[in-house]
Structures are given as C-alpha cells and as structure tokens.
C-alpha cells in the first residue's frame, strides 16, 4: 500500500492512497482548510476497520440490524509527540431481535482475527471494548436492551 500527501500551503495537505485513489484533506489546525488532523484519521481508520468487520459478520449471522455506529474515544499523552495512550471502542447496534451473543462473537473476531488496524494498535496501547444493543420499537423509537464493557485487548 502506498500513500502520498501533497502540500497545499500552510499546514494543509491532500492525501491519496493507491488503493482507493480518493483525495483526503489533512490540516494540522482543524477547521482552517476543512481537513482532518492526522491522529483523527488514525482513530477513524480504527473505527472504520472494525465496523466493516462487525457489520459483515452480523449480516452473515442474519441479524436484523437497522442501525450501526462505532465510536472510538482515544486518549492522548499530554507531552509531545502526544501519542494515543488508550482507546475505548463502543459498538452501538440498533435492530430487531439482535442477539447479544452474535454481537460479542463479531466483536471478538474483529478484534482478534480480521481488523489489522485494531490488531496493530492494540500492541501499542490498551483498547477497551464496549457495546450497546437497542431494540427498534414502533415509530422509529428504540430502547436499550444490552449494555456492557466487554474486555480490554491483551497487549503482546
């Protein structure tokens, strides 16, 4: 995989990767040019990687998922280089009759087998996994049926 960033002035860049070839705006001072900060992209990459795994596994398990979000809350060191020191990934699933065991297995498979971003980052800092399952009820409303901290991935 190859990635290239091109300087656009100040601290703004446009990046492209050789797989998607889609432009991504980067900016050291979010909001100045509308770009994301590099560390934000790492958190987004982690969220996107595990989200794709988990939803794919839930679909294969024929779970009736109507909504799915993954949130990554990453903590950073106070001193430079201000690396990530820990992260919490929260999987938020809405559906009809979504089985807790199916979600737990999907999260486990993503964390231990399929998501390279999570596998790589969990070797550098602890990642705690949490989940919420909401049952979809009438008129687009939903009610929480399961909520839990699941586990912290072991560091190798």
Residue spans of the language-model regions?
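Extended beta-strand/beta-hairpin segments
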Residues: 1-44, 55-156
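Alpha-helical metal-binding/catalytic segments enriched in His/Glu/Asp
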Residues: 49
